[in-house]
Amino acid sequence: MAATNIWAALPAKKRPLHQRARRPAGGRGREPEVPFTTDPSGNPAGRNCLEFLPPGGTSGCSATDGGATVPLALRPFLRERRPLGSQHPCPWHYLQVSDYDDSLAPTCFRAHLHRRGSSSTLNQASAMTDPNPRTAEASGLYTYSSRPRAVACQRRRHRDSILQPVEEPMSYGNIMYDRRVIRGNTYALPTGQVPGQPDPLELQRQQQARRRALARKRAQEQLKPRTPEPVEGRKHVDIQTELYLEEIADRIVEVDMECQTDAFLDRPPTPLFIPAKTGKDVATQILGGELFDFDLEVKPMLEVLVGKTIEQSLLEVMEEEELANLRARQYAYEEIRNVELAEVQRLEEQERRHREEKERRKKQQWEIVHKRNETLQKISALIFARQYLANLLPSVFDKLRNSGFFYDPIERDIEVGFLPWLMNEVEKSMEHSMVGRTVLDMLIRDVVERRINDYEHKEAMPPGQKTNVINGPNTVTDPSVTTLHTQKPVLDRVSSQPAPSQERKPVEEGGHLMAE
């Protein structure tokens, strides 16, 4: 706060740029307005600007009604004045054209350009520009409202010639030797660079930069002192030769400083805004019965109320009658609608029956046609088969008859049922006869073998013993007894033989023996 007050005490021209630029957008400060004297001798030192009117007043201004001698209490321009484009003494007679030009174009805005505020502002502006000093004295302190405008940029967008060196060497060159200038035919110009391919100039520039970096690195390596190469079998190793701990002998000067700032004060409450009173208060007294006579004024009101009441009653009665008529019509319509719905249902049912009958008859007719087609197909197939098989059936029947497919049932029954039984019975009887024959043959064979054995034994004995043997007491001459003794082993031997056909050979052998 102290620094701000110091800069505020200095003239506007001697303030720094950042202090001069901190102004509100309206162009006026918030400090209290203090009337300035019109005496040029009262200006502070170093202020060479046209902030005050000349002693003789202004000459020829339509906005200020000619040469006014009234001292203005506040300067219209709060920032440092620039050289005016015109020598007109009116402070409202100049307007800045642009931020890039220091000169001001001489213009003059009429009073309606400055009257953008309320009626009080207009009165104050008229009092400020009134040439009569009594009016200004009667109004006392006045306020000034300027035309809103954008804040001027204090920083220049282009450097001044002061900041540039005075003697700057000028570089000259022939533009025809510039690589960016193309010489030759316009139709033989090189085509544009294909997207995706690097620029040859850029590649050349990168290669040159890479070569320069390699050359610089090679030169640095050559200039840098090197340690001799180690002998064979050894290698260089970095070793710490400096001290690990270093004593800090420098004493740092320490100074203690302290600063106490003022405590923050609470923001005072904002005062209420009370606008200035612009109108006049006027009072009028009206006594009772002067403006309103009840007996006279109540008649139209009663007429309106009674008329509206009767009209509303009539409307309600008409509405009730209309509702009754609507209900009667609705009932009649409901009856007609029910009758029509019943008729519609009857017609729908009739249509449904007709449709079902139609579908049934169509199905029946389709079945008849289908059966007729099947019958025709069968008849045609039968006729075709008869015609085709007329010459084929006799030969087929003959072959089947010859093959045994067509036979006499009685003959087949005899062949299948009777003949096999007869053959079995014959075979059984033959088997029994064969068994009897076999038994008989075996008995005869046994007897013959015994006799042969006896005969051979007799021939081998001396002559005196032959009679004893033949006529001895133990000699059995009855053949039946011999047969009874030998019947059992013969029967056992016959039962062990399987078939009579196999016994033919022994029978034949027995026959031969018997023949012998």
From Swiss-Prot:
Coiled-coil regions listed: 333-369
A Pfam family: Radial_spoke_3
Region (Disordered), start-end ranges: 1-45, 120-139, 190-233, 459-516
Key word Coiled coil present: yes
Subunit structure: May be a component of axonemal radial spokes. Interacts with IQUB. Interacts with phosphorylated MAPK1. Interacts with MEK1. Interacts with PKA regulatory subunits PRKAR1A and PRKAR1B. Interacts with RSPH1. Interacts with RSPH4A. Interacts with RSPH6A. Interacts with RSPH9. Interacts with CFAP61. Interacts with LRRC23.
GO terms under cellular component: 9+2 motile cilium; radial spoke head
Official protein name in the record: Radial spoke head protein 3 homolog A
Function: May function as part of axonemal radial spoke complexes that play an important part in the motility of sperm and cilia. Functions as a protein kinase A-anchoring protein that scaffolds the cAMP-dependent protein kinase holoenzyme. May serve as a point of convergence for MAPK and PKA signaling in cilia.
Protein family per UniProt: Belongs to the flagellar radial spoke RSP3 family.
Compositionally biased intervals (Basic residues): 12-25, 208-217
Protein's gene: Rsph3a
Basic and acidic residues bias spans: 218-233, 502-516
Intracellular or extracellular location(s): Cytoplasm, Cytoskeleton, Cilium axoneme; Cytoplasm, Cytoskeleton, Flagellum axoneme
